[in-house]
Amino acid sequence: MVKIRPDEISNIIRQQIEQYSQEVKVVSVGTVLQVGDGIARIYGLEKVMAGELLEFEDGTVGIALNLEADNVGAVLMGSGLSIQEGSAVKATGKIAQVPVGEAFLGRVVNALARPIDGKGDIASKESRLLEGPAPGIIERRSVYEPMQTGLIAIDAMIPIGRGQRELIIGDRQTGKTAIATDAIVNQKGSGVICVYVAIGQKASSVAQIVTTLQEKDAMRYTIIVSETADSPATLQYLAPYTGAALAEYFMYSGRHTLVIYDDLSKQAQAYREMSLLLRRPPGREAYPGDVFYLHSRLLERAAKLSDALGEGSMTALPVIETQGGDVSAYIPTNVISITDGQIFLSADIFNAGIRPAINVGISVSRVGSAAQVKAMKQVASKLKLELAQFSELEAFAQFSSDLDAATQAQLARGVRLRELLKQAQSEPLSVADQVATIYTGTNGYLDDLAPTQVRAFLSALRSYLATSKPKYAQIMAANVFTPEAESLVKEAIAETKASFK
């Protein structure tokens, strides 16, 4: 028979009493009234906050968006197929956060910053709010450093600065994504971290972008956030904020970042779908009344930070798709008013074989020459003027056959300058090469060549400068087009013409 030892029992009881905690954990629990189409209506979560994360019985996470008198409308971050009427829902007391850090570079993640590239988990110690506050007025400084894209048409005439928001707008299949990926490829060696956010795109398109960036060795400094067309509307709506949070980590550590949102039209459509299912009153084009705030709070997070905060920057290139070139539709006009300029791509120019298909006439950068290096300023102003005059003359020349010699010469120059702006995809040019190219065109050195020979000649000239005039690149490292650099370019033009067939 087992002998009972009172002292041992009293010790155990004493230990249990010492370990007892009076802390009471209060959990707010509700019940699902209705679920479907990625929306759940919940009864009982009386103290839930707007935007608070909710946890369902099956592990699905939702966000409380509609706080009504007798129920809460939540959007689901998943299919929610195993959620039933009467299921319990728990309020977490947390606002949506995503992990951030250096480990994300070179990876493809979803809107919850979880890897989807099959390369294993991402180790991260830090996290940031999905919808963090934008920097205030005192925390910013004016944009003054250039963000080179490697495209002559943009860097010369629509310059983008670090910390700017420049909209890329145009119809489908006009080369919007190509400009964005070229900008990423051109950041190689500049220390700029790139974040590409794919919203509602085909999985094959995203795979193609990943392949292009890998071939160009650009994935080392790039993070891709992807929510494809088959993703729930909630995740498509959240993806841009995830991209901004990942970029903010680097911006606040004094680094420069470039974020591409491709495209915000799809995000607006996902938000419209959620809002209509939540029975929010529709406005123009059935979008909810706060669709402007949807984009403004995202794009205001792009900034050039002050000296006190480390002078980091986040440059945003949002993409908007238009229908039939209509830039006066609701979402395009909203985003045009939020951004610091727009690059307008035209289907007519694209179909005419001019790539990139930028309509220079209505494209603008509101930062302007403040974001250009001195060498580019020296040669670009003449290019802008000559192309503007050419556009006017070209329209006039269609109605008149007998033109004087000066007008004919100006038209011939304009045709060659237009050829000069053409560039193949994923072949960005350095500032030195761009300056030499523009100088050659604006000073009449292409006038005696046939328009079909222009691109081949310029390519030969750039190769000749690199191999036979290495001093030119050394001088241009200071980003100033000196008389010595000019004479080297003149020599190279003459020598290339002598051997050019």
UniProtKB/Swiss-Prot annotation:
Assembly notes: F-type ATPases have 2 components, CF(1) - the catalytic core - and CF(0) - the membrane proton channel. CF(1) has five subunits: alpha(3), beta(3), gamma(1), delta(1), epsilon(1). CF(0) has four main subunits: a, b, b' and c.
Residues annotated as binding ATP: 170-177
Protein's gene: atpA
Entry's Gene Ontology cellular component terms: chloroplast thylakoid membrane; proton-transporting ATP synthase complex
Class of enzymatic activity (EC top level): translocase
Disulfide bond sites: none
Leader sequence segment: none
Membrane topology: Peripheral membrane protein
Reactions it catalyzes: ATP + H2O + 4 H(+)(in) = ADP + phosphate + 5 H(+)(out)
Molecular-function GO terms, alphabetical: ADP binding; ATP binding; proton-transporting ATP synthase activity, rotational mechanism
Protein name: ATP synthase subunit alpha, chloroplastic
PROSITE patterns, per database record: ATPASE_ALPHA_BETA
Subcellular location: Plastid, Chloroplast thylakoid membrane
Family named by the database record: Belongs to the ATPase alpha/beta chains family.
Domain of life: Eukaryota
PANTHER family per record: ATP SYNTHASE SUBUNIT ALPHA, MITOCHONDRIAL
InterPro entries cross-referenced by the UniProt entry: ATP_synth_asu-like_sf, ATP_synth_asu_C, ATP_synth_asu_C_sf, ATP_synth_F1_a_nt-bd_dom, ATP_synth_F1_asu, ATPase_a/bsu_AS, ATPase_F1/V1/A1_a/bsu_N, ATPase_F1/V1/A1_a/bsu_N_sf
Matches recorded under HAMAP family: ATP_synth_alpha_bact
Functional description taken from the UniProt entry: Produces ATP from ADP in the presence of a proton gradient across the membrane. The alpha chain is a regulatory subunit.
